[in-house]
Amino acid sequence: MEPAVERKVPEQEEQLQPSHARAEDAPPAAVEEEDEAEAEESERRNRELKAGLHPLRRKLVLWYTRRTPGTRSQSYEDNIKKIVDFSTVESFWVCYCHLARPSSLPSPTDLHLFKEGVRPLWEDPANRNGGKWIIRFKKAVSGRFWEDLVLVLVGDQLDYSDDVCGIVLSCRFNEDILSVWNRNASDHQAVMTLRDSIKRHLKLPHTYLMEYKPHDASLRDNSSYRNTWLRG
């Protein structure tokens, strides 16, 4: 089966540079905040284990965006609606079994599955220094790959998973687009390792074309999927 929309893309130089910044280089207040959040997550998992449930490593939130074509009266942020959150395997399946499949969603529509505390906005503090890997699919096969990507995120299976903020399904008129958002667009090793991990978990060919775009570039050109920087 051919999963992708075939696209001819000119070669570009890789514009990401390796970064040596790590958690230990963060300001003390930021480190303290991360430690508190991790402690809260640990307490939550312990409570759920005692209740006989199967806790996820991170609580996740599902968001929905639907903009009526030709309507510009509302901002993108105003159009984002929270659907549900879940933190256990059991609550995930209850939610997922009732969700509409990509093939039944109108265009343009976006579904966002993000870690709790991170909003699916370029400007969110967790996202503003990051970017996203972009994967384009024919509409006939996108549902399968979206489900696989959801299960990968829920299972915390991606490499550099702490660097991953969330995933997005964008239903468009001629194609569907999946994207994986990460925190640090300047960490070349993390960005490229994440790309390889996505391909491996989705069983995409090694030569399959993916695109990367930093969120600050999206802010400049006000576009999610045009003018991507890195292809590979």
Swiss-Prot record:
Q: Does the keyword Oxidoreductase apply?
A: no
A Gene Ontology molecular function term for this protein is: RNA 7-methylguanosine cap binding
Region of interest called Disordered, as start-end residue ranges on this chain: 1-49
- The superkingdom of the source organism is Eukaryota
- SUPFAM superfamilies from the UniProt entry: eIF4e-like
The processes (GO biological process) annotated in the record are: regulation of translation; translational initiation
* UniProt key word Disulfide bond: no
Name of one Pfam family that matches: IF4E
The record ties this protein, via InterPro entries, to: TIF_eIF4e-like (IPR023398), TIF_eIF_4E (IPR001040), TIF_eIF_4E_CS (IPR019770)
Q: Which cysteines are joined by disulfide bonds?
A: none
Listed A to Z, the keywords are: Initiation factor, Protein biosynthesis, RNA-binding, Translation regulation
Q: Which GO terms describe its cellular component?
A: eukaryotic translation initiation factor 4F complex
- Which residue windows does the record flag with biased composition (Acidic residues)? 31-41
Compositional bias annotation for Basic and acidic residues? 1-11
Assembly? EIF4F is a multi-subunit complex, the composition of which varies with external and internal environmental conditions. It is composed of at least EIF4A, EIF4E and EIF4G. EIF4E is also known to interact with other partners. In higher plants two isoforms of EIF4F have been identified, named isoform EIF4F and isoform EIF(iso)4F. Isoform EIF4F has subunits p220 and p26, whereas isoform EIF(iso)4F has subunits p82 and p28.
Q: What does this protein do?
A: Recognizes and binds the 7-methylguanosine-containing mRNA cap during an early step in the initiation of protein synthesis and facilitates ribosome binding by inducing the unwinding of the mRNAs secondary structures.
Please give the family membership noted in the entry. Belongs to the eukaryotic initiation factor 4E family.
Record's protein name: Eukaryotic translation initiation factor NCBP
Protein's organism: Triticum aestivum
